[in-house]
Amino acid sequence: MKIPLRLLCFSLGWQLLLAPLAPAAAPDPIRAVLAAQVAAWNRGDIDGFMQGYARSGKTTFVSGDKVTHGWQTVRDRYAKKYDSRAKMGRLTFSGLTITPLGADAAIVLGSWSLQRAGDQPHGKFTLLFRRLPEGWRIVLDHTS
């Protein structure tokens, strides 16, 4: 009887060691942030779109060969590049995959596309979300 009990204790111990240390990040709040960003963009509201980003000097946006640091700098970049409703077009996100990295972080992979009168630019993105006191926010955005 002692051997099976030891085996049971050993087995349970390993299961506890291999179990996640923290609950996984919930994808629903992250999806809600992304949906709010799309809705804001499609209203022509860059400031509303930017609410999805961490309001921090460390927030980072990477696109092409350019790296932009800081929430305000990222916001200014968007405002300059998309200075009219025509340039903003209609945004959609698709193919979203959310991978929790623990209780307070997640990676999101997805595709973006803009429907505009003259063209339909599109690409991929990788976002690092962190759970902050104000909720889930993007701290790193790599868009191509």
Where are these regions (language model features)?
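Short, low-complexity N-terminal intrinsically disordered segments enriched in polar/charged residues
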Residues: 4, 11-52, 56, 73
